[in-house]
Amino acid sequence: MIKSICATLLLCSFFSYSFDFKYSNKYEFVRGITECTVHFNTIIPPQFRAVVVISVAKAALESNWGKSRFARLGNNFYGMIEIDNTNPHIKALDSDIMLRKYNRKCESVADYITLLNTGTQFTEYRKVRNKQTVTQQINLDEIINSLNTFALDKDYTNKIKRTVNYLLKEYPEIFLIVKGQNV
């Protein structure tokens, strides 16, 4: 089931879903990542969906609100690493690390949702999300705490929480439209 969900996301992002967005400020960035996340959430079952505001917060943190070199040149908003140098990528400066390069911005979001559903580092996240999907009681702090394996930064989950709080305070009109998508 997970493999078919991930295949659906990838197919939609690469072939049937040509939506792209432009941004020149935080509001447009937040709106674009939100729309991509909501789109993919509507084509997969609830237990595989990403929490919209967390998806946006992580994209904001990982890409400096879309201003990072990887975001600007490769539409990579989540710091997705590429291990095969024959695939499109951008090399990190002063490092051998390569980051994935996407044709469209929403492809990065689809890849992030796929990683949430397949990555071994997100096992705890999936348990928490699935429990909350069944009970239909979303606890953002609990979900965010389960993301502590995503980054080496020990303060990462606190940064996500602060960014989520900022997003909900500064852009309530955007997140009101996604209430049915678990914020």
Show the residue positions of the predicted features:
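Sec-dependent N-terminal signal peptides
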Residues: 4-13
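Catalytic cores of secreted/periplasmic lytic hydrolases that degrade extracellular macromolecules
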Residues: 16-57, 61-183
